[in-house]
């Protein structure tokens, strides 16, 4: 299986990533194709679709062996579920699936046509294995149930972002950052209100702590 593209986002590490695609639609990414796959003809007709499926590789989660059970973050990291009942990266084949919004096909200076997308849950440089259109007729299932994952649907925290710190963030990046923080990036099993967490975003290091349902940004620095 070949890598056909890589996505470039403002998140250089796993920490801070949305837990699923579509949760932070404001988070943009650019899918840049490998030289072999930069044929404009390969994208003919793609503008007619509002959303795409990205099939990608968990490049940071490769292991020599696999376990039939994993600890889903949504269950606090303490309860085991079958690997095929989860979207854990620790799988026999480390392949991920994300539904993203197609914001446009753009022409780059030296890398051919690229796809501008919104709502990706991928770190910068993630390898893309395939791209397919989202088909509402086939892919939307209104009667579907979400198992244990439905228990945490809609969870968010209130974000306190002091104005003097927010000013350090480029204006075009603020909305997505606040939306990311509202998703509470902490591991689900950590709830120490005094602990300081941090993650990289758009060339910045953002540090925060969480108490109850309130997240407070305490530092923003250039990396």
Sequence positions of predicted segments:
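Conserved positions in beta-strands of structured domains
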Residues: 8, 100-103
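Mixed-charge, low-complexity intrinsically disordered regions
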Residues: 1-95, 107-116, 120-223
């Amino acid at each position: 299986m070949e890598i056909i593209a890589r996505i470039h986002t403002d998140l250089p590490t796993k920490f801070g990533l949305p837990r699923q695609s579509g949760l932070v639609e404001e988070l943009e990414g650019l899918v840049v194709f490998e030289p072999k796959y930069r044929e404009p003809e390969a994208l003919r007709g793609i503008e007619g679709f509002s959303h795409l499926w990205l099939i990608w590789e968990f490049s940071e989660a490769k292991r020599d062996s696999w376990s039939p059970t994993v600890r889903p973050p949504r269950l606090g990291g303490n309860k085991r579920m079958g690997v095929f009942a989860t979207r854990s990266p620790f799988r026999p084949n480390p392949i991920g699936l994300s539904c993203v919004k197609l914001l446009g096909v753009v022409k780059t200076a030296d890398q051919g046509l690229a796809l501008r997308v919104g709502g990706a849950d991928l770190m910068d440089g993630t390898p893309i294995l395939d791209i397919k259109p989202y088909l509402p007729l086939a892919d939307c299932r209104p009667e579907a149930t979400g198992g244990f994952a439905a228990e945490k649907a809609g969870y968010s925290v209130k974000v306190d972002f002091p104005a003097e710190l927010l000013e350090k963030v480029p204006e075009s990046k603020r909305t997505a950052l606040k939306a990311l923080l509202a998703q509470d990036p902490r591991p689900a099993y950590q709830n120490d209100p005094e602990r300081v967490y941090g993650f990289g975003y758009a060339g910045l290091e953002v540090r925060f702590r969480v108490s109850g349902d309130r997240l407070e940004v305490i530092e923003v620095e250039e990396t």
